[in-house]
């Protein structure tokens, strides 16, 4: 099994601004290790003679002419919001510690 450490799980949680109990950290450590083991199994697949494909759906890039369209009326929008501050819509804080997200 891949060696994913609890410290690595805690580090990813910190970067993701998530908090886990010690039991959750242990569980995620085992689960992530199993996932990485399954992905590493792909290295063993013999792909000789299999043509390279970038997009199996065979879609093409569909381009259209870029046309400017009238947006929302700012005054009507601002009149409809419950809270505003300095000309912006004020929403509840998402990060409890005021982080850099």
UniProtKB/Swiss-Prot annotation:
Keywords: ATP-binding, Ligase, Nucleotide-binding, Protein biosynthesis. One of its GO terms (molecular function) is glutaminyl-tRNA synthase (glutamine-hydrolyzing) activity. SUPFAM superfamilies: Glu-tRNAGln amidotransferase C subunit. GO terms for biological process: glutaminyl-tRNAGln biosynthesis via transamidation; regulation of translational fidelity; translation. Allows the formation of correctly charged Asn-tRNA(Asn) or Gln-tRNA(Gln) through the transamidation of misacylated Asp-tRNA(Asn) or Glu-tRNA(Gln) in organisms which lack either or both of asparaginyl-tRNA or glutaminyl-tRNA synthetases. The reaction takes place in the presence of glutamine and ATP through an activated phospho-Asp-tRNA(Asn) or phospho-Glu-tRNA(Gln). HAMAP family: GatC. This is Aspartyl/glutamyl-tRNA(Asn/Gln) amidotransferase subunit C. It comes from Lactococcus lactis subsp. cremoris (strain MG1363). The gene is gatC.
């Amino acid at each position: 099994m891949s060696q994913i450490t609890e410290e690595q799980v805690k580090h990813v949680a910190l970067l993701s601004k998530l908090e886990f109990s010690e039991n959750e950290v242990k569980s995620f450590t085992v689960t992530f290790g199993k996932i990485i083991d399954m992905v590493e199994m792909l290295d063993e697949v013999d792909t000789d003679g299999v043509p390279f494909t970038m997009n199996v759906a065979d879609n093409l890039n569909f381009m259209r002419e870029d046309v400017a369209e009238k947006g929302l009326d700012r005054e009507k929008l601002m009149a409809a919001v419950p809270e505003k501050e300095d000309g912006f819509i004020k929403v509840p804080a998402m990060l409890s510690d005021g982080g850099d997200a």
